[in-house]
Amino acid sequence: MKIRIEQTSVEENEVILRCAQLDDEMLRVLSLLRSGMQKLLVWNEHREMLPLSVSKVVYCETVEEKTFVYTHDGIYQTALSLAELEDRWGDLGLFRAGKSSVVNLHEIQKLKNCGSGRIEALLTTGEKMVISRHYAPILRERLGL
C-alpha cells in the first residue's frame, strides 16, 4: 500500500482512498478513519456537555459506577462504560488496564514489570497506572513484547 500526503490550503481536510478492491485491509483503514472522527461526549464540573477528541484522553476510570475521563486539560465525566469506550476506540489506542480503568496506549511513556504478572505504566501526565495481571499478557501481545 502506498501512502501519499499532500498539504494544501483547503478549508476542510479530505481523505481519498484509492484501491483496486475494497478488501479487509482497506476496510480496516476506513474504520480507523471513521472512528478517529467520532467525538466522545463528556461533561465538565459545570455540567456543560462537550465533544472531546479521543486522542486527548490519557486514561479513564470508573468510581462508584461513574466513568471519569482524564486529559491533560482536566477531568470529565461520560455516560459510556469502560467496555463501550474500549469497544468504540480500542483501535485508536484505548486499552483495558483493569476492572475499573482504560488507558490510552499513546499516552504511556514507560512500562515496568512489577511482579505477580502486572505491569506499571508511567503516563505522560507523570501518573502511574497498574495494568492488571489479567490484561498484562494482552498488552504485551498487542505491543509485540
What are these regions (language model features)?
Residues 27-124, 128-130:
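Conserved binding/recognition cores within well-folded domains
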Residues 141-145:
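Short hydrophobic/aromatic patches at helix-to-coil boundaries
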Residues 1-27:
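N-terminal regulatory/sensing modules of transcriptional regulators
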